[in-house]
Amino acid sequence: MCKLRTSKSIIKRFKFKSKNKILRRMAGRSHLLQKKSSKRKQKLRKIVNLKKIDISSWKFRVPYID
């Protein structure tokens, strides 16, 4: 049987705090910022939890994380 491989792109983009808690950055803050208001850009700075539905579908991509 093949080894399970960890997706390196996911390891770089997300922080794993526990089995059911994964942190991610908000999308939409890398370019085209002139037309976005400062209030909107401030809200995009947040680090938020990944939804439970997404966590269950991503478990196989990072098999060796707690």
Swiss-Prot record:
Keywords of the record: Chloroplast, Plastid, Ribonucleoprotein, Ribosomal protein
Transmembrane segments: none
InterPro entries in the record: Ribosomal_bL35 (IPR001706), Ribosomal_bL35-like (IPR021137), Ribosomal_bL35_sf (IPR037229)
Any Gene Ontology biological process: translation
GO molecular function ontology, one term from the record: structural constituent of ribosome
Subcellular localization: Plastid, Chloroplast
GO terms for cellular component: chloroplast; large ribosomal subunit
Domain of life (superkingdom): Eukaryota
Signal peptide start-end: none
Protein family per UniProt: Belongs to the bacterial ribosomal protein bL35 family.
UniProt-recorded name of the protein: Large ribosomal subunit protein bL35c
Organism: Gracilaria tenuistipitata var. liui (Red alga)
Lineage, highest ranks first: Eukaryota, Rhodophyta, Florideophyceae, Rhodymeniophycidae, Gracilariales
